Amino acid sequence: FPVSLRYSIVSKTKGFRQGALPGEDYVEVGRDREESIKAAKFLQKAGYDMLNCDNGTYDAWYWSHPPIYMPENCNLEDVEFIKGYVQIPVVAAGRMTLDKAAQSIEDGKIDGVGFARSFLADPQWLTKVMEDREEEIRPCILCHNACFNMAHYKGVPNDQDLQDSLHLARCAVNAEMMQ
């Protein structure tokens, strides 16, 4: 079986329980690009087949799953950077636009792109893209109100009972996903 890892290139963390926001001036206290190069090479040598890349940490989760206020393609520059240091496929995740993703793949800067919430909003998303029917796509509104209910479960962050794990595939704009 292929082995992949959701790999955070830069932690985007300015202190304990303090994630950094886009454009904010801060000193990185977590993994930076230099450490990321070493870690990515180590993972490749250890036998990983692919790195599914984003940014962020537990304290800066919004880089991994960008909400509406995050810039489009917010992780792409760092993902393109790490691609230059490994020979295994590198996939970018995090509020990617189709045009920018396609261009980056065509230019050989990344090997693929991960789209997840788009499929919750519209399970026919890829078919509509391939058939040039993008105007018919029901877009993800990046609200985190349904797909990330576990981020603040019963008033406690990240404390969802595993018994409820079957109810995580939800989407505020797709009633068929509501369970």
Name each model feature, range by range.
Residues 1-179:
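Flavin-dependent oxidoreductase catalytic cores
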